[in-house]
Amino acid sequence: HCLLYGVTTAHVLAVEVVLPDGEVVVLGAEEGRAAGYDLRGAFVGGEGTLGIATRICVRLTEDPPEVATLLLDFDLVAGAADTVSAVIAAGIVPAALEIMDQRVVEAVEPFVHAGYPLDAAAVLIVELDGLPAGVAEAIARIETIGTAHGARTVRVAADEDERARIWKGRKSAFGAIAVIKPDYYLNDTVIPRTRLAEVLARVYEVIEERDLIVMNVFHAGDGNLHPLIVFDAREPGVMERVLDAGEEIV
């Protein structure tokens, strides 16, 4: 949900750290008014490579009064990608905008039973939150935008159970790749939202040219792509093709 709420570092006020030489320091300030270089942000961004956190002071965010989760499905991946760009261009900032392509849907649906349409080229998960009137208005606008870009259906989760099932599929995506192949190579890249459709089309071309399989599941709202090249490392020569594809994608 970093599209609306920001990444982890935005919610960490201070952190007590043990550095590699054993020194214990506090980075940031619990009252959120530390001066100088943002060493707290650098440490959080280092994802564990700069030391060990022993205490963390975080900023808590109040739960919104209204939350709605939408599921849109498309015949074309480009339609889902273009919908994301159009939603943001319309001034709507959802809490989350996530896309899963058909291979991902086929892998997760048998386990989570979220009701993802197996014949869809892509599904788009949209989460909205805020005041009830604002959420209702955003739902209506997104339905219009999605339909204009080829959405076959726009489904609004009816209750918390349905919301949880829709999200369980997204959160289970990486684990479900074992259904397809035992190994994977992950690219973690960021591109402009306006080029999502173009870049995804090229990713599929690169994979097809090398006779490989890719599964796309990603944070579409901020253009953060995670092309998962899945393969069996026991296959002779496959690693070379995978690495070549990964380099070309990046």
PLM regions: where:
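FAD-binding subdomain of flavoenzyme oxidoreductases
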Residues: H1-E98
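C-terminal substrate-recognition/cap domain of FAD-linked oxidoreductases
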Residues: V58-E62, A68, D73-A245
